[in-house]
Amino acid sequence: MTNPHDVIIRPVVTEHSMAEMGEKKYTFVVAKDANKTEIKKAVEKVFGVSVDKVNTLNYDGKVKRMGRTQGRTSSFKKAVVKLTADSKEIEFFQGM
């Protein structure tokens, strides 16, 4: 993936992810085929910070039923990005 905006899809705003912001950990939904190196480069380029570590989690879609019809929600990949100690915070999350 060449465009970093194709790697980072959206931020995850939950109570748990907001609590981790104090430790300079930020959570994003990322492209399913993105690896840790691509995620690190994309966050550094888009937000202008230096990344220390990237943890990824793959989520399978849940099975949902509506009467006799059965389907699945979309699966997705989540990344928890830890910034270095001397890095500035991501300004996008400051107002939350």
Swiss-Prot record:
One of its GO terms (biological process) is translation. Coiled coil: none annotated. Keywords: Ribonucleoprotein, Ribosomal protein, RNA-binding, rRNA-binding. One of its GO terms (molecular function) is rRNA binding. It comes from the Bacteria. Gene3D superfamilies: 3.30.70.330. Pfam families: Ribosomal_L23. GO terms for cellular component: ribonucleoprotein complex; ribosome. SUPFAM superfamilies: Ribosomal proteins S24e, L23 and L15e. Disulfide bonds: none annotated. Part of the 50S ribosomal subunit. Contacts protein L29, and trigger factor when it is bound to the ribosome. Belongs to the universal ribosomal protein uL23 family. One of the early assembly proteins it binds 23S rRNA. One of the proteins that surrounds the polypeptide exit tunnel on the outside of the ribosome. Forms the main docking site for trigger factor binding to the ribosome. This is Large ribosomal subunit protein uL23. It comes from Clostridioides difficile (strain 630).
